[in-house]
Amino acid sequence: MRTFALLTAMLLLVALHAQAEARQARADEAAAQQQPGADDQGMAHSFTRPENAALPLSESARGLRCLCRRGVCQLL
C-alpha cells in the first residue's frame, strides 16, 4: 500500500511538472510576442474627431489630432 502511494505521488509530481513546463513555454511565447520588434518601430495610429460628434468643440480645439506610438500619445 505504501508503494502504491509513493508511485501515485511520483506520477502526480511528474504530471504537475509537465504542466508547469507547458505553461512556462506559453508564457515565454506570449512575452516574446508582446515585445516590440524592429519591423513595427515606425507603426503609428492617428485619431481625429469627426465633425458631427455629440459634444461641440471650441474653435481652438477644432482639428485636434492624437498620434500614438508605443503607448505614448501626443496631441498634434
UniProtKB/Swiss-Prot annotation:
The protein's matches in InterPro entries, at most eight in alphabetical order, are given as: Alpha-defensin (IPR016327), Alpha-defensin_N (IPR002366)
UniProt keywords, alphabetically: Antibiotic, Antimicrobial, Defensin, Disulfide bond, Fungicide, Signal
Show the cross-link location (Cyclopeptide (Arg-Cys) (interchain with C-73 in subunit B)).
R65
Any S-S bridges, and between which cysteines? Answer: C68-C73
Q: What else is known?
A: RTD-1 is 10-fold more present in cells than RTD-2.
Similarity comment: Belongs to the alpha-defensin family. Theta subfamily.
Any one of the GO CC terms:
extracellular space
| Keyword Nucleotidyltransferase among record annotations | no
Instruction: Please state what the protein is called.
Output: Rhesus theta defensin-1/2 subunit B
One biological process GO term for this chain?
disruption of plasma membrane integrity in another organism
Q: Which residues form a coiled coil?
A: none
Using the UniProt entry, state the residues involved in the cross-link Cyclopeptide (Arg-Cys) (interchain with C-73 in subunit A), renumbered to this chain: R65
Q: Which residues belong to the propeptide? A: 23-64, 74-76
What tissue specificity does the UniProt entry give?
RTD-1 is expressed in bone marrow. Detected in promyelocytes, myelocytes and mature neutrophils and monocytes.
Give the signal peptide, or none: 1-22
Bias (Low complexity) occurs at: 30-44
How the protein assembles, per its UniProt entry? RTD-1 is a cyclic heterodimer composed of subunits A and B; disulfide-linked. RTD-2 is a cyclic homodimer composed of two subunits B; disulfide-linked.
One Pfam short name: Defensin_propep
Covalent link (Cyclopeptide (Cys-Arg) (interchain with R-65 in subunit B)) residue numbers:
C73
SMART domains tied to this protein: Defensin_propep
Please give the function described in this protein's UniProt entry: RTD-1 and RTD-2 have similar antimicrobial activities against the Gram-positive bacteria S.aureus 502A and L.monocytogenes, the Gram-negative bacterium S.typhimurium, and the fungi C.albicans 16820 and C.neoformans 271A. RTD-2 is 2-3-fold less active than RTD-1 against E.coli ML35.
Q: Summarize what the UniProt record says about post-translational modification.
A: Forms a cyclic peptide with 1 subunit B (RTD-2) or with 1 subunit A (RTD-1). An additional intersubunit disulfide bond is formed.
Cyclopeptide (Cys-Arg) (interchain with R-65 in subunit A) cross-link site: C73
Chain segments carrying region Disordered: 25-54
